[in-house]
């Protein structure tokens, strides 16, 4: 296994000097010596199928490995059934877009503690993550790996140990270590 280096989203340098179109990012990343690109859906999955497929085609041609960051408003640690339903929808929409572009990993945040102990929040998140995995399998997204990301704030679920524990639930889960959050 080799280490890949890339960016999350489009940098100011890219948008100011190259293009505002994400489909152009893979060629630029290759030209500057990078080999990975995390497509950002933090504010919602707003990429259409045609654009996603073009990003994937361009990434394949440039030798760029793709991943996708799911919306920030996913809340694994919230027990409210309506919030769980929405979180499942956000993750499955992310997986759909990831499949369109040929990305095999979807990065997601665990959410806030919401005045719960870390253990209580983690147990809720584990149950909700199982429901998300079931929905992903039901909708044909077994080939997409979900990557819970480490979080940096004290009131957020997702320190390194918590992320590692979440990832013990299923082989379709691997940790996303954000070194800026450790």
For every predicted segment, state its role.
Residues 181:
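Positively charged, amphipathic and often flexible ligand-engagement surfaces
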Residues 61, 77-175:
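Active-site acidic/histidine proton-transfer and metal-coordination neighborhood
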């Amino acid at each position: 296994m080799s280490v890949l280096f890339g960016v999350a989203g489009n940098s100011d340098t890219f948008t100011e000097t190259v293009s505002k179109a994400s489909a152009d990012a893979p060629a630029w990343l290759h030209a500057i010596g990078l080999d990975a690109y995390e497509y950002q859906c933090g504010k919602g999955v707003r990429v259409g199928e045609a654009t996603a497929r073009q990003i994937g085609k361009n990434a394949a041609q440039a030798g760029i490995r793709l991943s996708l960051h799911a919306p920030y408003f996913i809340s694994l640690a919230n027990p409210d059934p309506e919030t769980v339903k929405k979180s499942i929808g956000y993750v499955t929409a992310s997986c759909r877009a990831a499949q369109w572009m040929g990305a095999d990993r979807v990065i997601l945040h665990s959410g806030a503690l919401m005045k719960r102990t870390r253990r209580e929040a983690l147990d809720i998140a584990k149950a909700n993550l199982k429901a998300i995995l079931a929905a992903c399998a039901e909708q044909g997204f077994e080939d997409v790996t979900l990557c819970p990301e480490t979080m940096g704030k004290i009131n957020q679920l997702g320190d390194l140990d918590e992320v590692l524990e979440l990832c013990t639930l299923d082989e379709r889960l691997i940790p996303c270590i954000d070194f800026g959050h450790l």
